[in-house]
C-alpha cells in the first residue's frame, strides 16, 4: 500500500519535472468476452503466489547455501502477485486530486479510451504494458518506464507498420487471429498465422486477411468478428462527467503523504514537484 502511493507520487513528480501533463485512466467493468482471460490470470497469479511463499520458506529455513538467485526469483514473483484493491484505487484517486492531476473513470475497459485519446490528439501517447494498445491502433505507446533512469521506450505504430510492410488492417488481423484477450479459445499459433498471411499475400485476393482466413475455414467467423468489433474505437466518445479534475492542495497533500511515512524537510512549497521528503 505504502509502496503504491510512493511509486505513483514519484512518477507524477517526475512527469511534472519534465513538463508532462498526465491523465490517469481507470478501468470499469470488463466485457464478458474477457471472462476466460480473467480466470486464467487469476490461476496464474495463485500459482505464482504459492511459488513465492514456497521459495520464501526455503530461504528462511536456510536449506540452500546460495539464496541470491532465489531472492531475485522472489522479486519477479512478488510483482506478479501484487493485487490492487478497490481501496487502493480510491487512495490513488485521492492522491491524484491532491496533486491536481486529472483522471478519467471508464464505464468499461480503459484501453479503448486511451487509444481514442491518442488518436484524437487529446493525448500524445499512452503509457501501458498492455500489448492490446497496438491492436487498437494507438499511434504511440510508451513502455518500460524507469523512474531511476528517467527513461521510457516509445513505440510508433506507423513506423512499425512501415518497417514490417503491413497495413494496419493486416497487422490487426494477424494479432487477433493469434489470440487477444477477447478470443483466446479461437486463436491460432502466431507462427502459423504469419505463414498463412504469406499464403494470403501470394494469392493476390482483394479481401482482407481475416476474411480470407474465414473463407478458408481456418478461423471461427463469429469469434473473430466480435473481437475485431471490440477493438474498433470509431464509436468511442469521451464523457466529460467522467473526467475528474482538481486544482490540488499542497497542505492536504503533505498531510496525506505523512500518513504513508513521508517525512518532509523545511522548504517553501510552491508546487507538488518541490515537496522534498525522506521516505523510510
Protein language model features and the residues they cover:
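Conserved beta-strand -> loop -> alpha-helix junction used to position metal-binding or nucleic-acid-contacting
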Residues: 27, 132-133, 137-142, 149-158
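Acidic, metal-binding active-site segment of PIN/NYN-like and related structure-specific nucleases
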Residues: 114-144
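Short acidic loop-to-helix transition motifs that present clustered carboxylates
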Residues: 108-113
Amino acid at each position: 500500500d505504502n509502496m503504491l502511493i510512493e511509486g505513483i507520487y514519484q512518477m507524477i513528480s517526475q512527469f511534472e519535472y519534465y513538463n508532462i501533463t498526465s491523465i490517469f485512466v481507470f478501468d470499469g467493468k470488463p466485457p464478458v468476452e474477457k471472462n476466460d482471460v480473467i480466470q486464467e490470470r487469476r490461476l496464474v497469479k495463485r500459482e505464482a503466489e504459492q511459488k513465492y511463499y514456497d521459495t520464501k520458506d526455503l530461504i528462511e529455513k536456510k536449506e540452500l547455501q546460495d539464496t541470491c538467485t532465489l531472492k531475485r526469483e522472489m522479486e519477479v514473483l512478488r510483482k506478479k502477485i501484487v493485487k490492487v484493491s478497490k481501496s487502493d484505487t480510491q487512495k490513488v484517486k485521492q492522491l491524484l486530486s491532491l496533486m491536481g492531476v486529472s483522471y478519467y473513470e471508464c464505464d468499461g475497459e480503459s484501453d479503448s479510451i486511451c487509444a481514442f485519446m491518442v488518436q484524437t490528439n487529446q493525448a500524445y501517447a499512452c503509457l501501458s504494458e498492455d500489448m492490446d494498445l497496438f491492436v487498437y491502433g494507438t499511434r504511440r505507446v510508451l513502455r518500460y518506464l524507469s523512474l531511476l533512469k528517467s527513461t521510457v521506450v516509445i513505440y510508433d505504430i506507423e513506423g512499425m507498420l512501415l518497417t514490417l510492410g503491413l497495413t494496419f488492417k493486416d497487422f490487426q488481423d494477424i494479432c487477433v487471429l493469434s489470440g487477444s484477450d477477447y478470443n483466446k479459445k479461437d486463436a491460432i499459433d502466431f507462427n502459423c498465422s504469419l505463414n498463412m498471411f504469406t499464403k494470403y499475400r501470394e494469392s493476390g485476393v482483394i479481401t482482407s486477411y481475416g476474411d480470407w482466413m474465414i473463407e478458408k475455414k481456418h478461423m471461427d467467423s463469429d469469434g473473430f468478428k466480435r473481437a475485431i468489433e471490440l477493438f474498433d474505437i470509431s464509436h468511442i466518445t469521451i464523457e466529460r462527467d467522467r473526467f475528474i479534475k482538481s486544482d490540488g492542495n499542497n497542505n492536504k497533500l503533505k498531510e496525506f503523504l505523512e500518513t504513508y511515512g513521508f517525512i518532509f524537510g523545511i522548504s517553501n512549497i510552491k508546487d507538488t514537484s518541490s515537496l522534498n521528503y525522506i521516505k523510510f
